[in-house]
Design a protein with these regions (language model features):
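PLP-dependent amino-acid enzyme catalytic core
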Residues: 1-495
Length: 495
């Protein structure tokens, strides 16, 4: 039986449904399973399968307590007509390399892959304490993309409410409008005075507050859960697209079964790339996973030195979704790389909490570095790469993907190993930055920038983004970090 426990202790023993409903462990750790890797996905049978079929193969290994009927229903509901490409995450040639587009979902960012299915998972979980009236309040901090994708996934979902916090003034105009215009009777959106790390840390504190939990349960029949990638139900759907990429490379006759592939992944919270590590543990032939960061290059420093130090300046950059100093999902990778040493992980995370830094043992770092590569791009390089990619390939990339594109250009190429760049968001979410980079007009609004970009490149803005210009703003709340808990409590009472 596959059970889940915290990265920091083995006291819990939860099913995947319980772990998904709970979100985060009581001790602040993240849910992991020790059986990861015991069962492999059959790579030889991937070619020719649809995304939905591959999702079933992968998720039935990772979430064995969901029945075949439940999983198929979740997959069918999540990966249907709301996607603009039937391949869901299509792989396309990009010069001598490949790009996997993760932005064809309803909110134009890679988060849709997981956040279209997470609410379906949640709907098939049951209350832990037997309270038949129990409702779930999803509480999430966003650096830009998660918020809208979570809102779109959970809007009007039965028995569920959602509250999203984002750092005031630190997301793009398009991202902010995507959230503030969200429809749905069970949704709440609030800006926070602070940066993403402040908001995410406060959300983690809210989850750890037993008194608040007791009040919410007794007053409102509400339990809290998370839609951030700390929730294992957010992470596992992302494993699927690594297998899908491999299937598409097989179909395009780029590789034969068993050939290794490298993936270059723009990431801040480490979830997107951790999914690639999970794919490798499930038998996918992954040679290297390369972390691409922006100027907030805490992961680059960690992977080169073995010391993780969040005591550093926080930069607000043109790739806002990666402006993160506390990379939550790294904890799961450290757990597996330390041979599942919960005591070590608890100690490292305590050091991070207390001193703002930790250092991993040298042998463990060597093991990590044998799989994970790393690089980062500053803002000038990001702009140059958006232009370079357009000039060389006639392909428009957003500023996050451009970090990955830069790192990929810097890496030595092995002609025998295909490289796949994960493209995490539509360029139309950041039209001003993209236009600046391409030397196009940026004098108008973000929406005028979209039209200029479409005209100049012969591409089309996603209708949901272009339509934001005339959408009604429903939410304009702003709170201090200290006011977040009160905001959640009010939202829970209204559920």
């Amino acid at each position: 039986m596959t059970t889940f426990h915290s990265t920091r202790s083995t006291t819990d023993s939860l099913t995947s449904k319980q772990a998904i409903r709970k979100g985060i462990a009581d001790d602040g750790g993240l849910f992991v399973t020790d059986s990861l890797g015991e069962t492999h996905v059959d790579v030889a049978s991937l070619a020719g399968k649809s995304y939905q079929q591959i999702a079933f193969d992968v998720l039935s290994v990772l979430l064995p307590d969901f029945s075949e009927t439940e999983l198929k229903a979740c997959i069918d509901e999540a990966y249907g007509a709301q996607w603009s490409d039937e391949k869901i995450t299509p792989v396309k040639p990009l010069g001598d390399d490949y790009v996997m587009e993760l932005f064809n979902g309803p909110t134009s960012a890679f988060k849709d892959v997981a956040l279209q299915i997470l609410p379906r998972f949640m709907a098939r979980t049951t209350p832990a304490g037997g309270d038949g009236n129990e409702k779930i309040m999803i509480v999430t901090a966003t650096s830009g993309d998660t918020g809208k994708a979570a809102l779109a996934g959970f809007a009007d979902a039965e028995g569920t409410g959602i509250t999203v916090f984002y750092p005031e003034g630190k997301v793009s105009q398009v991202q902010e409008l995507q959230m503030s215009t969200q429809a749905g009777s069970n949704v709440n959106v609030c800006a926070v005075k602070g940066n993403f790390d402040d908001a995410q840390s406060a959300v983690k504190r809210i989850f750890g507050d037993r008194e608040l939990a007791n009040r919410l349960a007794s007053d409102s029949h509400v339990v809290l859960s998370s839609a951030n990638s700390i929730n294992v139900g957010r992470l596992v759907p992302q494993v699927v697209y690594y297998f899908s990429a491999y299937a598409q490379l097989l179909e395009q006759q780029v590789i034969n079964v068993g050939d290794e592939v490298e993936f270059v992944v723009p990431t801040g919270n480490f979830g997107d790339i951790l999914a690639g590590y999970y794919a490798k543990l499930l038998g996918l032939p992954v040679k290297h996973l390369v972390v691409a960061s922006d100027k907030n290059n805490v992961l680059f420093d960690f992977l080169t030195s073995g010391t993780y130090n969040r005591q550093r300046p926080f930069y607000q950059t043109i790739s806002p979704s990666m402006d993160i100093l506390i990379s939550s999902n790294l904890e799961r990778m450290l757990y597996y790389m330390s041979d599942k040493d919960t005591r070590l992980i608890a100690m490292l995370m305590n050091d991070l909490n207390q001193w703002g830094a930790y250092e991993v043992p040298e042998p463990m770092l060597a093991k990590i570095r044998s799989l994970f590569g790393t690089g980062w791009a500053d803002e000038d390089q990001v702009r140059e790469m958006i232009a370079d990619c357009w000039n060389k390939n006639h392909y428009v990339i957003d500023p996050h993907t451009a970090c990955g594109y830069y790192v990929m250009q810097q890496m030595p190429r092995d002609p025998l190993t295909p490289r796949v760049l994960l493209s995490t968001a539509s360029p139309y979410k950041f039209p001003r930055v993209v236009n600046e980079s391409l030397g196009l007009d940026v004098s108008g609004t973000d929406f005028e920038c979209m039209d200029v970009l479409a005209e100049a490149t012969g591409t089309t803005a996603p209708a949901a983004l272009r339509g934001l210009e005339t959408a009604d703003v429903r939410f304009d709340h702003v709170v201090d970090i200290d006011g977040m808990e009160g905001f959640v409590e009010q939202a829970a009472k209204a559920l």
